[in-house]
Amino acid sequence: MMEHDVEDLINQLDISEKAMLLSGTDLWHTAAIPRLNIPSIRLSDGPNGIRGTSFFNSSPSACFPCGTALGATFDKKLLFEVGEYLAEEAKAKGVSVVLGPTVNIHRGPLNGRGFESFSEDSTLSGLAASYVILGLQSKNVQACIKHFVCNDMEDERNSVSIDVSQRALREVYLMPFQLACKYSNFKSLMTSYNKVNGEHVSQSRILLDNILRKEWEWKGTIISDWFGTYSLKKAIDAGLDLEMPGKPRFRNVNTIQHLVGSKELSESILDERAKNVLKLVKHSWQNTEAENHCELNNDSSCLREALKKFASQSIVLLKNKKKLLPLSRKGTFAVIGPNAKVCNYSGGGSANLKPYYTVSMYDGIAAKIDGVPEYALGCHNYLNLPNIANLLVNPRTGKHGYVAKFYLEPATSENRTLIDDYDLEDGVVRFYDYCNDKMKDGYFYIDIEGYLIPDEDAVYEFGISVFGTALLFIDDVLLIDNKTKQTPTNHTFEFGTIEERNSIYLKKGRKYNVRVEYGSAATYTLSTNLSPSTGGRYSIGCVKVIDPETEIDYAVRVAKSVDCVILCVGLTAEWETEGEDRKTMTLPSLSDKLVYSILQSNPNTVVVTQSGTPIEMPWISEAHTLLHIWYNGNELGNALANIIFGEQNPCGKLPITFPKKLKDNPAYLSFRSSRGHCVYGEDVFVGYKYYEAVEREVLFPFGYGLSYTTFELSNLYLKNCGERLRIDLEISNTGPMSGAEIIQVYISQIVRSVNRPVKELKEFSKVVLCPKETKLIRIELDIKYATSFYDELNEKWCSEEGEYNVLVGTSSKDIALTGKFTLPKTIHWTGL
C-alpha cells in the first residue's frame, strides 16, 4: 500500500471499486481491493477500551476509565499515556481505527451517554481529546473522534433536530472538535445521528464541507455513525466518505454506478470520497492485518498498573471535613451498599465490553486490610434484574454460566440440526454479529440450560427481555412467556421487549433446572425496521427477593458493629447507557434512605458515590466524608482502595458541575425532543457558565476536588507576547503529604459588547509537589482562542479590544490570583 500514492491508486480504480470503498463490508471492516494491494482495515469501539470485532462471545479487553473519569484527571501527560495504552490494545486486536474519543458536551445531567464524554467545558473536552489522540497516533493507531456534532442526548437521537444558535454551535459544541483538529490533526471523524438546525449532520454540506473541510482545512476521513446514514447522493455530495456498517443501506455498488453513468452523481465527487478512505487506509498501513486477524490477550502487570493509575487519579475527594481520610488499616471495617460487590466498571451501550478481569470496591478494600470486611447489600439498585449467569452453574463445566446450544429448528421440532454449542458466562448476550453459514434468513434457536442451587429458602424473581422470542422454564414448568405476547421497549440500543418477570419460591440446597428456549430476531413478533440478520439479543436476570426495610435494618446492624464503614452507592451501566437518557438525577431505589440510615449509625462513614454524570445528594449535609468515583475500568476497586488508605493522594477534579437538584440545571426545560425538535435555549451558558451567570448555588462546582494536603498559589506575573499570553506563578505544597494540584486559568472580558459568560476555562496544568516544595509554573495561552467569541453578524470569530481579567485558581469557584491584560485592537478571524 505504501508503495503507491493515493492519487495514483484512484486513477487505477474503476467506478465499482471506488464505490466499494465508500461503505463497510461488515460491522467492523472497510473494503479491500486485492487487485491493487489495498487492504481492509478494522475499526472497533471505542472510547474506554477496544472490544474487537464481536458483540457475541467477544474476546476480553482492558476497560479504561470512562470519559468523565479521564476528564477529571485534567492531566495532559496522563491522557497521552491513555492513548498509548489504548493503541497497544488496538494492535492486539488487529484494529487500525479506534472509535473515540467522545467529545460531546455535558449540556445536562441526564444524557445516557454522558459518561463517555469528558466534560461540560469545551476547552477541557478539546484538549483532553487532543492528548488521547496524540497518544494513539504515536503508536500508529488512528482515532475517530465523535460524535460530530450536538449528539448530547439519546432521546429520538436519529430524528431529532438540535436547534442551536450559530454562536453556541461554534463556541460550545464545535469547539472540542476544532481544538482537537488544531492540536492533534485527527485522521477520521464520526458524524452524529441527529439533525442540527433541521438537517442530518451526515448529509450537511455546511458542517462537513464548509466548516470541517474548507474553514478548518481538515483532510481526513468522515465516517457515519453505525446506521447513521440517511441518503445516498446527498450524503456523498455533502462529504460523508464512509457509510458504516456494511452491508450498506444506501451505497449499493450498482446504484452508485448507475448514478455516475447517468450524471446524477459526479465521478469527481466519487473520487474525493474514495481518496479520503484511501488516506485512512494509508495512515493505518502499519497496523493493517487480514480480516481474520486473531484477537490477542494483551493483559499484563504493566497494563494493570497503568489502569490503576488512570483510575486513581480520576477519583475526586468532595468532602473530608473531619479528616477521616486517609484511613488507617487497623480496626474493623464494613463495606456496604449495592455498588460494593458488583464492579460497575463501565457504562452501557457500545462503550461496554468484556473485561479481562474486574476488581470490585469490596475486593479492593478487602485486599488492603488484615481481616475480612463485613458486608451488607443495604438495598438493590438494578433497573432490570441482575445477570442470571452469576447464579447459574453450567452442568458441563461446574462453573458459573450455562450451556447454549444453537439449532436451525425450534424446540418444538423433533429432528433438530445442531449448528453451534457454547459455554457462556453472561446472561446478557447480543447476536448482532453472530454468523453461521447454515443459517437461513436469520433464523436460529438456542436451548439455554443451567442449574441454580439457592442458598436459603426464598422467593426468587426471574426476568427476560429479548429482541427475538423466549420461554423460561424452571424444572420444565413454564415461568415466563416472552413469545406469545410481547411488549416493546423504548430503548434505542437494546432493541426488543421490556423485561417480562415472574417469581417462584425455591428451597435451600435443592438443584433447580433453569431452561430457556430462545428464538432469534427473525422470530420477533413486533414490528421493527431492523433486519432479522441482526440476530437479536436476550437478557436473563434473577434475584432473591428481599424485604427492603429488613435489608436496611441488617445494614445498620453491620454498620454499628465495626469501627469504620465504606458505603458504596450510585448508578450502573443500566442507568447510564447508550439508547436511553435518565429521567431523574436521584439515586435508584432506596439508596438515599440507606445513606441516611448508615450515616446515623456510624460516625466513621466514608460515602463513595459512583456515576458518570451528576446525581442528587439530599443527605449531603450529614456526610462529612465523600469520594466520587466514575466507571473506572478493570482496576476500579484497587484504585479506590489506594485513595482510601492513602497510597495515592486524591487529585481528581470535577469536569462537570453537580447541581443541587435536577431543576437547577440549564437544560432542564429543553432536554428532550419535543415533536422532533430540541431547542438549546441556554445558548452559550452551559454548565458552570450558566450557574455563575444566574448566581445559582450548586452542590459542587466545576473543577472542584480536595486533597490530603494543602496548596498555595502566589506571585502571578503576566506578559503579553503578541499571539501568546505568558502566565507565571508559584505554587507551594503547604501540607504534610506529597500531592498534585490542578492550576486552572479562566479568562473574563471586563467590558463586553455581547452577553458572555462570567469567565471561561482556557488552560490548565497539573503540578506534583512534595511536602513544603514550591515550584515556578509557566502557562501559555493562545490569545486569539482565549479572548474570542463567535460574531454571528460577521460570521467570524471576534477577539475584541479591551481589558481582560486572568483568573487563576483550583476550581471555577476557588480563584486565588487575578491579573489583567489589554488587547489594543479588535481582530476577526476564521479557520484554526
Swiss-Prot record:
Entry-linked Pfam families: Fn3-like, Glyco_hydro_3, Glyco_hydro_3_C, PA14
Which SUPFAM superfamilies does the record match to this protein?
(Trans)glycosidases, Anthrax protective antigen, Beta-D-glucan exohydrolase, C-terminal domain
- What GO cellular component term, any one, is given? cytosol
Name the EC number(s).
3.2.1.21
Annotated ranges, domain PA14: 397-556
Gene Ontology biological-process entries: glucan catabolic process
Keyword terms, alphabetized: Cytoplasm, Glycosidase, Hydrolase
Q: Which GO terms describe its molecular function?
A: beta-glucosidase activity
- Alphabetized SMART domains for the sequence: Fn3_like, PA14
Q: Does the keyword Cytoplasm apply?
A: yes
Per UniProt, the enzyme's principal EC class comes to hydrolase
The listed locations are: Cytoplasm
Catalytic activity entry: Hydrolysis of terminal, non-reducing beta-D-glucosyl residues with release of beta-D-glucose
Cite the active-site annotation. 225
Q: Which PANTHER family match?
A: BETA-GLUCOSIDASE, BETA-GLUCOSIDASE-RELATED
The Swiss-Prot or TrEMBL record describes its family as follows:
Belongs to the glycosyl hydrolase 3 family.
This chain belongs to which protein, by name? Putative beta-glucosidase
Q: Which organism is it from?
A: Schizosaccharomyces pombe (strain 972 / ATCC 24843) (Fission yeast)
Its lineage opens with: Eukaryota, Fungi, Dikarya, Ascomycota, Taphrinomycotina
